[in-house]
A protein has these predicted regions:
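Bacterial carbohydrate/catabolite-sensing allosteric modules
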Residues: 1-161
Length: 161
């Protein structure tokens, strides 16, 4: 929604395929929009937890921060980052927007409600079991992409208005 300086809150992309995939999708989307990903705006957390997201954002905010939005690779990390942003005197979404991936239920109950890309958790579980059983029976490992939905919360400010 008009943001040009977007920080990425990720777990170490060298340690996790989930981090690698989500970060590479984020970076590709930025490049497609003509926005070069800035290395200084990559915030690496230790893991995918609320605590780790909070710690990583606190550490990043010790340096000047001119990003207007944060993309977190997990809802839990975003929730932690929101706390650190508020502690630093920033208001969400007025001073900094935040969006994440997962669609966990608690993201609907925090304030402001987190904007998140929801994964089809039940379908993921079902398809995982089906794929595993197929492999056990000697079948090929299929690549599967499941649809996601955007749950628009209250954590993103529209800068185009």
């Amino acid at each position: 929604k008009g943001h040009r300086r977007i920080a990425a809150l990720t777990a170490d992309p060298d340690d996790s395929s989930i981090s690698q995939l989500r970060y590479s999708g984020y970076a590709r989307a930025l490049r497609e929009l003509g926005i070069p990903p800035e290395e200084e705006d990559v915030i690496c957390a230790d893991d995918f937890t609320v605590e780790s997201g909070c710690r990583a954002m606190r550490e990043r905010l010790k340096r000047p921060a001119d990003f207007t939005a944060v993309f977190a690779i997990a809802d839990d990390m975003a929730i932690g980052a929101m706390r650190a942003l508020r502690e630093s005197g920033r208001s969400i979404p007025e001073d900094c927007s935040i969006i994440a991936i997962d669609g966990i239920n608690v993201s609907e109950y925090i304030h402001p409600m987190l904007t998140t890309l929801c994964q089809p958790m039940t379908a993921m579980g079902t398809k995982s079991v089906e794929l595993l059983l197929g492999v056990i029976r000697g079948g090929a490992h299929d690549h599967l992409t499941l649809p996601t939905t955007l749950r628009a919360g209250e954590s993103v400010r529209d800068l185009t208005k």
